[in-house]
């Protein structure tokens, strides 16, 4: 049976691995992406002081290496191993691929993995057999396994690899044969060892195996976890991967340099900065927007809803204009805060006409029982109000952002070099799909849209150069984009409150997520809680709704369920961006954020709704750009607290830092943002249906 297992095993089946501390000269802390669960197994490479429980990082000159498995939790912390995922054998294959590379590169003579048999899904022996085959096939006969260690312990499965031409007892870090367990006896055939408990004679390798197990049985994985340094960026990278991807050499090359473009801005402020601020903050532009919206709304309420006579249109228009202007006068017209206040005002004055609507609606009643008619009326009113609010927010999103479009049309991108302009034009044109697919690990050289791998490499290099030259937009500007995200990645985002963009991030200076490029599909997210709860369908701010007809597919493959996200991103002024202007499609008012960007999630709002068609799993996410200066790359965690309480407490030497540190709070701002309750109504106005794909891809 065991031979059959090894014959069926594909030794090329390795899983995606992320180095969780890229700063280390010798990579030694890794996560392994085994499936789409939000918790993933990982492993640490380390060494121990002889005979003790004290572990340390590998360094040049070490000859004995230990592999310690762990679990990377949804919050990005390290905990005791919970399991190896659905395929323990593929996990072991991936681990020993890294181990063999490390041993060869750093001339390590021995390596040992110890794993609880209870965590192997009953495949402990298969794992040992597979490891044996891998070592024999990949080491060219230079390394062998100490099989005498396989069955020594009922609790642990041991795998020890050592260089074939080096005696185990001569390797620093391998314990001497225990005099507590064995008596050494000289004989004509050499030294033999007698087991003190049984009196049986054993081979030297059996004595070494027993001594190794005796020493390591006393060691705890907890001691390894206590002071582990991990990179928050690397964790976010590992948890933003989808299961199906093509990790080419170029993917790995650009992944390794992504952090270079997340540094604090060095570019000068764009010449249009003051004009932008005036355009969205001036009372004149707000008065104009309020007047245009009010005139259109008054006519709609008269002609479409018949709420009042034609002679009253001008009076109602003036009233609506005052309501809107008073709501938005203190906020930039493209900000979430402005849209939120606008949505609350619109909702309020539409409610004033509810009695008019009910009078008309009740005339359509055809003898239904009161209970049935009440439910019909409630649903019809909610649908009518939802449609109205979505149209209103759609209109304001375009009109309020008008100055941004005019300014972008006049921008010529003259600061960029010819090669940088070429990269920008290729990206803003039809090349963005292939460019971002490569950065996302989705590019297939046999099936691409318009650009070959060589052309993509040139385009990315030109774009990277453009970001180094770069633009800096003024502070206080919100940029918008959308994204369709798989359920596992979204769940990791919810837990971590941080998201990592591998690709170049197309955003707009206008609130395009509320329907600029199509019919508004999700319009109720900006409302205050009472009104939002009346209109949303998921009733779930951060969670995912699985419809009954999706349950089976979701269980088989969690990536089946998608979450539609509208991003409202602040803080883009902190990093160099590319403002294409006329080098792109100027009416999109595009701002390209750099690849490798990390954002902190400040707020997630349920944007689901039903205006006749149900839209589940739509979220408005307010986020903030985090630079490398704001993001501490690694910390030392208190493993005792972590495993006992789930808290991730940072340590400095032997002194705990007082503030609790975890992925829900590590990037929290000094100033807590107060999110108005009417946010819900605007969130549900999110529409990514007909949006250009570059504003969605990710």
UniProtKB/Swiss-Prot annotation:
Q: One Gene Ontology cellular component annotation?
A: virion component
Recorded hits in InterPro entries, A to Z, give: ADP-ribosyltransferase (IPR003540), Phage_T4_Alt-like (IPR016225)
Tell me the GO BP annotations in alphabetical order.
Answer: regulation of viral transcription
| Site residues, Cleavage | 7-8, 633-634
Localization per Swiss-Prot or TrEMBL: Virion
What CDD domains has UniProt attached to this entry? Answer: VIP2
The EC number(s) attached to this protein equal 2.4.2.31
Q: What reaction is this protein's catalytic activity?
A: L-arginyl-[protein] + NAD(+) = N(omega)-(ADP-D-ribosyl)-L-arginyl-[protein] + nicotinamide + H(+)
Under the heading Pfam families, the entry gives:
ADPrib_exo_Tox
PTM remark: Proteolytic cleavages at the N- and C-termini by the prohead core protein protease give rise to the mature enzyme.
Active site annotation, chain numbering: 481, 506, 590
Q: What is its main location?
A: virion
Q: Name one GO molecular function term.
A: NAD+-protein-arginine ADP-ribosyltransferase activity
Keywords from the UniProt entry = Glycosyltransferase, NAD, Nucleotidyltransferase, Transferase, Virion
Q: Does the keyword Manganese apply?
A: no
List residues of the TR mART core domain. 375-628
Main function: ADP-ribosyltransferase that efficiently ADP-ribosylates one of the two alpha subunits of host RNA polymerase RPOA on an arginine located in the C-terminal region. ADP-ribosylation of RPOA alpha subunit enhances the transcription of viral early genes. Also ribosylates RPOA subunits beta, beta' and sigma 70 and performs an autoribosylation reaction.
Family indicated by similarity: Belongs to the Tevenvirinae NAD(+)--arginine ADP-ribosyltransferase family.
Q: Report the protein name in the record.
A: NAD(+)--arginine ADP-ribosyltransferase
